[in-house]
């Protein structure tokens, strides 16, 4: 605390209090504040007369209300919500109450609104009180007065599905083309809600069929969103533009596809809608159908969509079906001949942090096994993306997905672009899981690089491990990783498994020092100190001659002139823990 500034602070607080008090006094000085009738109403409470009138209205006491008619000023008062007695009377079932109240009110109050901008007529319409609305209209109330939200009585009648009310309003001058909230007309709302009778009424009363909302949607587009084919047919017959586009260039056809009604899609195509017009994002109707999983709509769009338009968009519907996890749509597209190896255009890829390109990557990221199977069976390549599909599956720990990718040629020896290690990156996800580790090793993981250390038996120079961050790019050795304090306990098991897949290897001094403390060190030492069996060396030689691609190819293995038992040995089937349906994998 600073005592030197206490006097100044006290003076400042005193001055502030004086200013606040003076301003409050000024507000309530006669002639300064509340100098208008409107301000007086806002700052005053309802009088006793108002309360008596309101009670008579709400309880339906006609005689009592008629007796209060002489208190004209009270009929000009409003409560905290801005409701006049006339507003309260407008929502009563007894029309006589409204007549008495209106006759007692000054004509200047007939168009007065509540704090929400609602007139007495609007309140009667929103309460679906036809007789009250009729009476107010006969008195000359404005049928086109809008609320603060921009809603008109006619639009409210449409929302309430009150056909007779809408007819009444139109007969008394309601504008069917009046722009309401979001620049929508009553026809917009009727079309959106699928109210055919209302649409017919609006069109018969002169509604413009192609009015655009603030987002550029026409009534036809809104009807298409809901799949209201009867209304769409009527609008098209009245000349609605089938080629109209919204502010984002979304076509009516695209909106119909978004709704998923195949009959609506077919109807628009019959009237000449173009399936090759993209929205501003570049997406075509076929993309939307695939993404939403609308199978029947997709089936209609496939034959009418040009491949050139798809290429220009930079994204295939195959991507969309895979991203949305819709294998039934994916199967349809594959059967129709769409390329499963179509890669995202650069302008699309930049929206993804991982710079993904293939449809397979989307399916793997979703853990969508049926879609992955379909794509791989159709020839999808698993090594096309900057982040390898196998890496995503390993991160998930999904055995079946990993096995599926490996059987179709996923590269077990990929290297991450960030923090590349001296050994292939896939290993780091399997250190705690023998099932996944064996999967990688069985499919040709480069185990020898894990034992490749330039220091050998020499003492490693001391250095602190900098950690794995995007700012640390170095050729980190396996011995540096597995000897970390939080991984040392895994070193014995990992190295022991790896020895099943290599010939004689040298263990560097740093790794050896850690292994000597592990339970499996005697077994590891025995293997390292003795020649490997001829059977084991032959397996390694055969695998090396065959190559990784042939090893994972079932067709090639079936034609190999070897006994089945020997084939199984070459493929390390005795170590295929996932194939043996073992559920344990954590050490």
UniProtKB/Swiss-Prot annotation:
- Protein's job: May be a substrate-recognition component of a SCF-like ECS (Elongin-Cullin-SOCS-box protein) E3 ubiquitin-protein ligase complex which mediates the ubiquitination and subsequent proteasomal degradation of target proteins. Plays a role in the inhibition of cardiomyocyte nuclear proliferation by mediating the ubiquitination and degradation of MAPRE2.
Instruction: Recall the taxonomic lineage recorded for the source organism.
Output: Eukaryota, Metazoa, Chordata, Craniata, Vertebrata
Q: Which family does it belong to?
A: Belongs to the ankyrin SOCS box (ASB) family.
UniProt subunit comment? Interacts with MAPRE2; this interaction promotes MAPRE2 degradation.
Biological process per Gene Ontology, one example term: intracellular signal transduction
Involved pathway(s): Protein modification; protein ubiquitination
Result of knocking out the encoding gene: Asb14 silencing promotes cardiomyocyte nuclear proliferation after myocardial infarction in adult.
Repeat among keywords: yes
Q: Where is the SOCS box domain?
A: 521-576
The protein depicted here goes by the name Ankyrin repeat and SOCS box protein 14
